[in-house]
């Protein structure tokens, strides 16, 4: 099975905080894919809010999205769009 990889920069003011992590985890869970988020030496399942929070990803940090599974391409597209939209937050 092919593994896909994308990079995206966190651009919202508060970074990957609880509300943003929850939105990302809910979105990732909607796809038939295993998505892993990597930031530096840390990695977490995109479906785990706690794991995402433990990445301690702030504004300006670049994360790598790794995906595998039937819907991996669509999942990575959707997650990149969410991050680029600043998790639908005002800042």
Curated annotation (Swiss-Prot):
Q: Which PANTHER family match?
A: PHOSPHOCARRIER PROTEIN HPR, PHOSPHOCARRIER PROTEIN NPR
Domain of life of the source: Bacteria
Pfam (any one): PTS-HPr
Q: Identify the PROSITE patterns for this entry.
A: PTS_HPR_DOM, PTS_HPR_HIS
Keyword Coiled coil part of the UniProt annotation: no
What gene is this protein translated from?
Answer: ptsO
Q: Does the keyword Cytoplasm apply?
A: yes
**Stretches assigned to the HPr domain:** 3-90
- NCBIfam families from the UniProt entry: PTS_HPr_family (TIGR01003)
User: InterPro entries attached here?
Assistant: HPr (IPR050399), HPr-like (IPR000032), HPr-like_sf (IPR035895), PTS_HPr_His_P_site (IPR001020)
Main localization, broad class: cytoplasm
What keywords tag this UniProt record? Answer: Cytoplasm, Phosphotransferase system
Describe its function. Component of the phosphoenolpyruvate-dependent nitrogen-metabolic phosphotransferase system (nitrogen-metabolic PTS), that seems to be involved in regulating nitrogen metabolism. The phosphoryl group from phosphoenolpyruvate (PEP) is transferred to the phosphoryl carrier protein NPr by enzyme I-Ntr. Phospho-NPr then transfers it to EIIA-Ntr. Could function in the transcriptional regulation of sigma-54 dependent operons in conjunction with the NPr (PtsO) and EIIA-Ntr (PtsN) proteins.
Any idea which residues are catalytic in this one?
17
For this entry, the protein name equals: Phosphocarrier protein NPr
- GO biological process terms held by the UniProt record: phosphoenolpyruvate-dependent sugar phosphotransferase system
Annotated Gene Ontology cellular components are:
cytoplasm
> Can you tell me which family this protein belongs to?
Belongs to the HPr family.
Cellular compartment(s): Cytoplasm
């Amino acid at each position: 099975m092919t593994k896909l990889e994308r990079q995206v920069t966190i651009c919202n003011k508060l970074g990957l905080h609880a509300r943003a992590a929850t939105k990302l985890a809910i979105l990732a869970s909607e796809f038939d894919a295993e998505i892993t988020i990597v930031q530096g030496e840390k990695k977490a399942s995109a479906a785990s809010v706690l794991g995402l929070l433990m990445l301690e990803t702030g504004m300006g940090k670049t994360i790598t999205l790794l995906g595998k599974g039937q819907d991996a391409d669509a999942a990575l597209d959707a997650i990149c769009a969410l991050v680029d939209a600043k998790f639908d937050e005002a800042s």
